[in-house]
């Protein structure tokens, strides 16, 4: 990958948020990935709201971990694999990632969009 910081977000909101990714590439490698969601109303991004306990995923559902924890696990998978295409299936789906039960495929699709045309 070409060095740089790359971002992408969905064009429209769904359930009050639109997904967003930021990817940092250094020396040709993905060294940081941040999966988040921009709120339609309010100030807090979904990641921050989750960290602060305002998103309440485990309190309000049978989720195994808060949203930010699952987002970090998914982002770690991208750092491990170094290519969103290696994680996304041919139909745009994501196989199970240990400890992630939220729908995460849109973030990997956005990662692919952010990195489009950035190969060395």
Predicted feature locations:
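Active-site- and interface-proximal helix/loop "cap" or "latch" segments in soluble metabolic
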Residues: 1, 9-120
């Amino acid at each position: 990958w070409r060095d740089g910081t790359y971002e992408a977000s969905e064009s429209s909101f769904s359930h009050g948020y639109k997904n967003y990714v930021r990817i940092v590439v250094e020396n040709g490698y993905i060294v940081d990935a941040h999966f988040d969601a921009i709120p339609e109303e309010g100030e807090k991004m979904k990641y921050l709201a989750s960290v602060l306990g305002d998103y309440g995923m485990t309190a309000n559902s049978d989720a195994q971990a808060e949203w930010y924890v699952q987002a970090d696990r998914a982002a770690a998978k991208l750092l491990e694999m170094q290519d969103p295409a290696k994680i996304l299936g041919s139909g745009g789906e994501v196989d199970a990632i240990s400890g992630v039960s939220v729908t995460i495929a849109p973030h990997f699709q956005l990662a692919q969009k952010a990195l489009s045309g950035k190969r060395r």
